[in-house]
C-alpha cells in the first residue's frame, strides 16, 4: 500500500553536508522524496513537534539541538513507507543499527542520530501537516 511518511534530517547531519548522501540511501530503498525543504526550526516549532517527550529528561537538550542549526524536513512516499523508512533509518542507537542503515552510516551518537522518521501512519499525517500543505507535496 502506498503511504507517506515524514522525515527530518537533523542538524548533526546537515552540519556535515550529508543531505545528499542520506537522500541517496532513502531513494535506493525505493522511497520517493515528494517534498523537501531546509528550515531552521524555532523553539516553538521544536517544542510542539517533540511535545510527546516534554516530561522526559532529555527534552530541553533535544529542543536545543533541533533549533541550533538548520534541518531538512521531508515527505517520503512509497509502499509501506512508514515501516520501510524506519528500517532504512536503523535503531535509535547507532551502535545497535544494522549495517547500511542511515544511522549506522552517519549517526554520531544516540543523541545525534542524524534522522527522525514517523512511528505510525497517523503520526506521519500529523507531522507532515506541521510543515507542508498538500499543494507542496508533489508525488
Curated annotation (Swiss-Prot):
Record EC number: 2.7.4.6
GO biological process: CTP biosynthetic process; GTP biosynthetic process; UTP biosynthetic process
Residues noted as binding ATP in the record, renumbered to the chain: 10, 58, 86, 92, 103, 113
Keyword Transmembrane included in the entry's annotation: no
Domain of life: Bacteria
Compartment(s) where it occurs, according to its Swiss-Prot or TrEMBL record: Cytoplasm
SUPFAM superfamilies named among the record's database cross-references: Nucleoside diphosphate kinase, NDK
Pfam families: NDK
Listed Gene3D superfamilies: Nucleoside diphosphate kinase-like domain
Signal peptide: none
GO molecular function, one term: ATP binding
Keywords, in A-Z order: ATP-binding, Cytoplasm, Kinase, Magnesium, Metal-binding, Nucleotide metabolism, Nucleotide-binding, Phosphoprotein, Transferase
Residue stretches spanning the membrane: none
Cofactor needs: Mg(2+)
Enzyme class: transferase
Family designation: Belongs to the NDK family.
Entry-linked PANTHER family: NUCLEOSIDE DIPHOSPHATE KINASE, NUCLEOSIDE DIPHOSPHATE KINASE DDB_G0292928-RELATED
Assembly and binders: Homotetramer.
HAMAP family with a match to the protein in the record: NDP_kinase
Protein name: Nucleoside diphosphate kinase
Organism: Caulobacter vibrioides (strain NA1000 / CB15N)
Phylogenetic classification of the source organism: Bacteria, Pseudomonadati, Pseudomonadota, Alphaproteobacteria, Caulobacterales
